Amino acid sequence: MPRTLGLISLALILAAIVSPVVSPVGTAAAAGTGVSSLIAGTPIRSVYVRPPRGAATATKPLQVLLALHGMGGSGEDFSKELVEQADKYGWLLVAPTIDYGDWTNPSVVAREDPVLIRALADYLDQLPQLTGLQTRRTVLILGHSRGAQLAHRFAEFRPDKVLAVAALSAGAYTLPQASGPQGGLSFPYGVKDLAAYAGHTFDASHFDRVQFWVGVGGQDTNAADLPRQWDSIEGTTRVQRAQAFEAAMKQLGANSVLRVFGDAKHDVTGEMRLAACAFLGSAMAPRAPHGTPLAAEPVAY
């Protein structure tokens, strides 16, 4: 979309959102006057915003669901399959379109994700002013593939802003550890030097309050799809790497569930999507005492 048209598109959708009757159907929203300064110079090309049905008469702040697509996708397309669940749970969908760089290059990831996380955090902070809708302080995040990588790293950088994460089919993880069997784990492999990227050290006390659900297809096991730099730390397939991340979460004492969908490959199936949304919906309920196992049942692998 040309940038000029993008400016017009966002102006139109925000005008619709802040009108007395909030449209239940979203429209593509791109970098506009109020948003462009927040995402200028970043790989974020546009932001799709869709309020849930009934948002115009809502008496409580809306729960934001930040939806993060994978390589080559778009926020609007990724959100289409989430609309029904967003209406069911009352989520304000926020789905950026991101022009990701080479995710197989750790140096690119180490440069790119801190920029994306800062920009998205700033955007979420400004969302009430941009839309006229009040939002809850912490957000839910659902990401697939490259988006799942960004989703869990967002929580590692800004656990204060995240209620729960559903990460589907990530190709590589930043383990919530400063070291492993082979020594120190610097970003993007671990959080040893997170202060150099986030401006603060890894906050384990806040991070272990974030509820995590990690999903992966049981047939998503093609090692050729993944960069080799993570092999010695997390394994050679998406399933092994999901297991490694889950093990690191358990070692930390964090709230985490791993679910392996036996017949699924890399695509997001309806079963995976519904399970992820059900988890995120349950995360909105009052929390049990810290350390209580989450309700979602992991699938044996």
Describe each PLM feature range.
Residues I98-Y100, A170, F261-D263:
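Active-site loop/turn elements of alpha/beta-hydrolase fold enzymes
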Residues L66-L68, L168, V216, F261:
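Alpha/beta-hydrolase
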Residues Q243-Y301:
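C-terminal catalytic histidine-bearing segment of alpha/beta-hydrolase fold enzymes
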Residues A164, A172-L252:
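The feature captures the conserved acid-bearing segment of alpha/beta-hydrolase catalytic domains
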Residues V22-V64, V139-L142, R146-Q149, R158-D160, ...:
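A domain-start/cap signature at the N-terminus of enzymes
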Residues V108-G132:
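Alpha/beta-hydrolase active-site loop
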Residues I8-P20:
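Bacterial N-terminal signal peptides
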Residues A55-W103:
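Short substrate-entry loop that stabilizes the transition state in hydrolases
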